[in-house]
Structure formats: structure tokens, C-alpha cells
């Protein structure tokens, strides 16, 4: 059985499929690329704690044999923000703390 996470009672996240699904209308979905899906999973697992950029690099890319640049990291965070907005989430669900990290 696939592990799922509910975000703000509005969206279901299925990491194995890289899928964000609107709970109120399951026909509204957004597919994430694997790095973006791993970024979101890491944020969820940290339960509101700030995650350092270097931790993302290690957990999302390096452990999986990939290289990453700061630009690639920020592009994936931006992709997550757009996905949440596309599904109707208002406000900034992903918060960037300059020179510190990112939190959900």
C-alpha cells in the first residue's frame, strides 16, 4: 500500500507517484518530478522544522547519485510552490528563510 500524506487537509501527496491530489476534487492532480517529490517528502518528514539547503542537496540528490546546483534546488522549490497554487492553496505553504533553509 502506498504511503500518503495530507497537507493542510486540502491536498493528498503520494511520494511514490510524485502526485499531489486535491481532496475535494480528485480529478485535479499535479505530477511532480522525482527531485521535487523528494524535496516535499523531506519537508513533510521534518514536521515544520527548517531544512538547510545542504540537507536537501545530500538527501534529495547526492544520496541518489545526482549532482545539483543552487539554481536546480531553487527551481524545484519553485515548482512545488506553483503546484500548490495550481491546486488552490492560498498563501506561502513553503517558507524560505534566507541563509537558513526552507520549511513547510
In which residue ranges do the predicted regions lie?
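Residues that recognize and position ribonucleotide moieties
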Residues: 11, 49, 95
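Short amphipathic alpha-helical recognition elements used for nucleic-acid or partner binding
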Residues: 29-60, 80
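DNA-recognition element of transcription regulators
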Residues: 31-40, 66-85, 100
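Short, solvent-exposed secondary-structure capping/transition elements
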Residues: 51-52, 86-93
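Short helix-coil junctions and helix-kink-helix linkers
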Residues: 59-67
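A short linear beta-strand->loop->alpha-helix hinge motif most characteristic
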Residues: 90-104
